[in-house]
Amino acid sequence: MLTLLGIAFLDPSVARWVAQTPAWMLVAFRQGTTVLEVVFGFPVSKFALGFVLLIAAAVFMRRRRPLALVLLYVGATHLTARLAAGMLKNVFGRERPFEALPDYEGAFFVDGSSFPSGHAAHFWSLFFPLALLFPRYRLPLLVLPLFVSVARVAVGDHFLSDVIASAALSALVAWGFAYIFRMPRDERIEAVPVASKEAVTEEA
């Protein structure tokens, strides 16, 4: 619903308003986004983190199953949302704000790549599974996806509805995999290897 409202009413107004963002703030948004891209593996591949999480899940599956399940859940959510966002870009073909303005006419199906936001999907698809597993840490976890979403809109690379759609997509994928994997809330990641716990049981 928020995405539809954004497309219908808010997108052009918000895009024109953020076009007045001070230069120093734009620099901060761009540099901050660049730093996050490096930290989260964008120079290697936009999908690198998802594959790393899945590989780590496979490595830990036998000896540290709780940790492996968390890695599998987060990795599957992240990779699926990231891939889905990329495919939807090709489906909707929306122009970016700097391409569509000032004569905004919806800007869909014109061979663009704005809707939904890949950057926003990248970070929201990490936030939602972690927030579902560790609700007590939701607020600090929220910092990165919010920063990236605001930054992408502020620098004119995305409309408001682009990042809202990415958040909604990531939430749906996270909840879907939570149901499939039957992930409990506040999952406890135990540091003790399975072999060690079995040994303790035998001694008892």
Model-predicted regions and their roles:
Residues L101-A204:
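Membrane-embedded catalytic cores of phosphoryl/pyrophosphoryl-handling enzymes
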Residues M1-G112, A121-S149:
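Hydrophobic alpha-helical bundle signature of multipass membrane enzymes
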